[in-house]
């Protein structure tokens, strides 16, 4: 769609070489969940630009409060999760589960926050997999390599970002 086209132009204009492997691993139909490591703010944009499936994401509540991001979240049927509010989190899990059952894809970062250690991953939050188990859908693991370099404050040097869609794990 239009958002995807804009994202692809931004990537090209932003001096980013996006190397993508495994697009054939993205299910062509029915809903699924993508679980990716989280290195930086650019992660969602890289995945959204490369994945043709209608996709939403589960965001931390603080991002949903930023006006421009809020509009994009609404347009993509993304949901904000308040990690301090268990009842609200359960509601989001139920909403995502229903959307996945209707054929939509959702992206979750199971680390819950960005790793500040380059390509090193943080521990996963166990609850982040509830959407996949409740919706009984395939899980597509996504590996991002060097995306932390993209919005680095050091300037506008060319960056090569690797994005790997791994084989789906069936329910």
List each model region and its residues:
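Catalytic core of membrane glycerolipid acyltransferases/transacylases, capturing the structured
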Residues: 1-5, 11-14, 28-86
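Short gly/ser/thr-rich secondary-structure transition/capping motifs
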Residues: 13-21, 89-90, 145-147
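Short acidic-hydrophobic, aromatic-tinged amphipathic segments that line or gate anion-handling sites
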Residues: 20, 79-82, 171
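Generic preference for hydrophobic
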Residues: 20, 34, 57-58, 163-165
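Residue-level preference for the first positions of well-ordered beta-strands
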Residues: 31-33, 105-109
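Short glycine-rich anion-binding loops that position phosphate/pyrophosphate groups of nucleotides
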Residues: 38-40, 111-115
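A cross-family acyltransferase "interaction/gating" segment
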Residues: 68-71, 101-107, 116-171
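Anionic-ligand binding region
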Residues: 88-97
């Amino acid at each position: 769609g239009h958002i995807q086209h804009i994202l692809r132009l931004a990537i090209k204009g932003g001096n980013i070489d996006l190397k993508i492997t495994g697009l054939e691993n993205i299910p062509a139909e029915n809903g699924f969940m993508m679980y990716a490591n989280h290195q930086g703010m650019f992660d969602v944009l890289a995945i959204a630009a490369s994945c043709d499936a209608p996709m939403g994401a589960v965001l931390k509540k603080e991002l949903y409060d930023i006006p421009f991001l809020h509009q994009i979240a609404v347009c993509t049927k993304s949901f904000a999760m308040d990690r301090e509010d268990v009842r609200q989190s359960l509601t989001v899990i139920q909403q995502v589960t229903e959307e996945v059952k209707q054929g939509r894809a959702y992206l979750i970062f199971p680390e819950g926050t960005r790793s500040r250690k380059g390509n090193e991953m943080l521990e996963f939050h166990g609850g982040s997999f509830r959407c996949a188990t409740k919706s009984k859908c395939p899980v597509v693991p996504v590996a991002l390599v060097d995306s932390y370099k993209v919005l680095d404050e050091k300037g506008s040097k060319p960056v090569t970002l690797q994005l790997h869609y791994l084989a789906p794990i069936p329910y």
